[in-house]
């Protein structure tokens, strides 16, 4: 029997919801995103004048953004560039976006409930099918 090379999935779309940190160029420190935008994990904020699906919200102390489903790599990259440009244009001038996995924050940026909320709500263990217990904040390290 001859094997056929047919795609298993057709019309695959790829989205994304990465986080970025804020760096304060005046104080030379990482700055909490809490209070800069009204978007939350439960109610993300649509980015003005961009198509449906471009959203942003606070996640712990980071800014999280969402892109619409992309049909190909070029579209996916373009959506990320649009989102990063939008966020930079809508933040105070002294704040820059920093793309890295983790950052240490001064204690004055960690005194809100939001700054001490980690992970998805709720978050599940895929192997056990059970809800995970959210991690506790141990020090001033925050991760994306």
Residue ranges and their predicted role:
Residues 1-143:
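Terminal catalytic/cofactor-binding subdomain
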